[in-house]
Design a protein with these regions (language model features):
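Juxtamembrane intracellular "pre-TM" segments in multi-pass secondary transporters
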Residues: 26-36, 215-253
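Extracytoplasmic gate region of multi-pass secondary transporters
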Residues: 60, 249-290, 297
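Conserved MFS/SLC helix-loop-helix module at the cytosolic interface between two early adjacent transmembrane helices
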Residues: 90-125
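Helix-to-loop junctions at the C-terminal end of transmembrane segments
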Residues: 91-103, 299-314, 399
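Helix-loop-helix hairpin linking two adjacent transmembrane segments in secondary transporters
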Residues: 127, 159, 167-216
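Cytoplasmic helix-loop-helix junction between adjacent transmembrane helices
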Residues: 134-172
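C-terminal transmembrane helical hairpin of 12-TM major facilitator-type secondary transporters
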Residues: 314-361
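A late C-terminal transmembrane helix in Major Facilitator Superfamily
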Residues: 368-404, 411
Length: 431
């Protein structure tokens, strides 16, 4: 039986009725396509997902020359980046129910159009327009990422394949985060950072047109059934209420938020830790950063593959709990170890464990939320944006109060709370 479908998945949740937690869908035993076949089907979604990460990568990579050009100073431009997180939180929360009420392709096209406009504004180098750039990038990705993830999941008619499709999108994002810096630095040798932004503006414009036309092509056979399904969707406020009644969904969103806060807080001070503890300069530390990024990508990729197996040896709830235990132990271990050769594998473990948790959250949200998955993924993305915003602050507070041991305590505490909530999610699957 083929796992692909051209219509959005339908379930009891299309009318707001939650599926019994832990219950398999009628076709959950269907064959899950291989990664290569999925990639051939989903490459436009994966490319758009990768493109969404590039604007801020250019901004971070060339922060010093951009600051010189704008006259705003490095510190001021660094603070502008926080505007993107706040915009993502606000837009993601406000528009979450709308992701399920419009065609996913059109939502993705809108997000890409906003990113194209933001890149064009950023290329000006003007301080105020750079502030607008940061706001628009945050807003655009808040719409783009959940729309792409939900659209990829909707291409398949069984839970295992839908979850795998969603995690392939997130794996693409982690791979892009790993490779984007050198990929934007090399072309910049020819056309500068402005050329990078104009190039991403052009790419996002082309992709926006592609998804717009793709959405229009769906107005053929089956469009009436899809329109009827959209008409049967709950209202704006009702979507939030129904999402809260689905078993384990709210704890899952909180797990994602806390995990993100802990991981981003850890990354914010990792370079300072390796410099103070082991005397690693920025050059050698780049290898540590690559190790962490590679571990995150591989953890996300293989966790998604494990969860999509036809006969998974471990449930998503149990794997998430185990990964949080590993993440907690490894994170605390990194900040307390005095050996570089012990710190390096612990750093890799932190990245792989957090990536596994991220894959589990995405998979479980896709499986549990049915036709409300777009709303759920958007709320989840907003929560993660809030986690990014809070993580560095909490890690810094711990550092100020107790050195790196204080940072370990603050971020480890967040992970511990996430672990408790993961057990709540696991219990909800058996209720």
């Amino acid at each position: 039986m083929s796992g692909e479908t051209n219509a959005p998945a339908t379930s009891a949740q299309a009318t707001g009725q939650p599926r019994t937690a832990g219950a398999a869908s009628p076709d959950s035993a269907a064959t899950v396509p291989g990664d290569l076949r999925m990639t051939r089907l989903l490459w436009p979604f994966m490319l758009a997902s990768a493109a969404g990460l590039v604007p801020f990568t250019v901004y971070s990579t060339f922060l010093v020359p951009i600051a010189d050009e704008s006259g705003g100073g490095v510190a001021a431009l660094g603070q502008l980046r926080g505007l993107g997180g706040l915009a993502a939180l606000a837009v993601g929360s406000a528009l979450a129910p709308l992701i399920d009420r419009v065609r996913r392709e059109w939502a993705a096209a809108a997000g890409l159009a906003v990113l194209a406009a933001s890149a064009a504004l950023g290329a000006s180098g003007d301080f105020l327009l750079l502030a607008a750039f940061c706001l628009l990038v945050g807003a655009g990705t808040a719409v783009l990422n959940p729309a792409l993830t939900a659209a990829a999941a909707d291409r398949f008619d069984n839970d295992a394949a839908a979850g795998r499709a969603a995690t392939l999108i997130t794996a693409t994002q982690s791979l892009t985060a790993l490779l984007a810096a050198p990929l934007v630095a090399l072309p910049a040798l020819v056309w500068g950072w402005r050329g990078d932004l104009w190039a991403i503006a052009a790419l996002c414009s082309v992709l926006a047109l592609y998804f717009l036309l793709r959405g229009r092509r769906k107005a053929g056979p089956g469009a009436e059934a899809e329109a009827a399904g959209k008409a049967g969707q709950p209202g704006y406020v009702e979507s939030f209420r129904l999402l809260g009644t689905l078993p384990g969904v709210l704890p899952l969103v909180l797990v994602a938020m806390l995990r993100t806060a802990a991981f981003m807080g850890y990354l914010a001070y990792l370079a300072a830790f390796y410099d103070e503890r082991f005397g690693l300069a920025p050059g050698p530390f780049a290898m540590v950063w690559t190790l962490s990024g590679t571990s995150f990508f591989l953890g996300n990729l293989f966790a998604g593959r494990l969860l999509s197996a036809e006969r998974a040896r471990i449930s998503g709830e149990r794997l998430m709990t185990l990964a949080l235990v590993v993440a907690l132990a490894a994170l605390v271990g990194v900040f307390f170890t005095r050996s570089l050769w012990l710190s390096l594998p612990l750093t890799a473990l932190v990245g792989a464990a957090h990536a596994t948790v991220a894959a589990c959250v995405t998979t479980l949200l896709v499986r549990r939320c049915g036709s409300l998955r777009g709303t759920a993924l958007s709320v989840n993305a907003a929560g993660m944006s809030f986690g990014v915003f809070c993580g560095a602050g909490l890690g810094g507070a711990g550092l100020a109060l107790g050195g790196f041991a204080g940072t370990a305590a603050a971020l480890g505490g967040l992970t511990l709370v996430a672990l408790v909530l993961a057990r709540v999610v696991a219990r909800s699957s058996t209720d």
